[in-house]
């Protein structure tokens, strides 16, 4: 599978490594599947991982390295 949207360059401008990006996207996707409310009103992607990547690209979800947790930005 190839990521075309959001672009990997835009995603990596928000997260410091591909590893951090994949962990962050997976954690956020699990949260969305568990019923957490989305941080965006509209998504281009239907799947949870795609939605998580869109939230990361929009700057709505970030990594907190001190706690290794997903943080939602208002």
Curated annotation (Swiss-Prot):
Source organism superkingdom: Bacteria
Gene Ontology biological-process entries: DNA-templated transcription
Gene Ontology cellular-component annotations: DNA-directed RNA polymerase complex
InterPro entries per UniProt: DNA-dir_RNA_pol_omega (IPR003716), Pol_omega/Rpo6/RPB6 (IPR006110), RPB6/omega-like_sf (IPR036161)
Matching Pfam families: RNA_pol_Rpb6
Alphabetically ordered keywords of this record: DNA-directed RNA polymerase, Nucleotidyltransferase, Transcription, Transferase
Gene Ontology terms for molecular function: DNA binding; DNA-directed RNA polymerase activity
EC supergroup of this enzyme: transferase
EC numbers for this chain: 2.7.7.6
Catalysed transformations (reactions): RNA(n) + a ribonucleoside 5'-triphosphate = RNA(n+1) + diphosphate
Protein function: Promotes RNA polymerase assembly. Latches the N- and C-terminal regions of the beta' subunit thereby facilitating its interaction with the beta and alpha subunits.
Family: Belongs to the RNA polymerase subunit omega family.
Subunit structure: The RNAP catalytic core consists of 2 alpha, 1 beta, 1 beta' and 1 omega subunit. When a sigma factor is associated with the core the holoenzyme is formed, which can initiate transcription.
Protein name, as recorded: DNA-directed RNA polymerase subunit omega
Upper lineage: Bacteria, Bacillati, Bacillota, Bacilli, Lactobacillales
């Amino acid at each position: 599978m190839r990521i075309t949207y959001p672009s990997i360059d835009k995603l990596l401008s928000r997260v410091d490594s591909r590893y951090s990006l994949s962990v962050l996207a997976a954690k956020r996707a699990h949260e969305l599947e568990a019923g957490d409310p989305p941080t965006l009103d509209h998504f281009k992607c239907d799947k949870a991982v795609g939605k998580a990547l869109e939230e990361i690209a929009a700057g709505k979800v970030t990594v907190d390295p001190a706690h290794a947790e997903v943080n939602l930005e208002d």
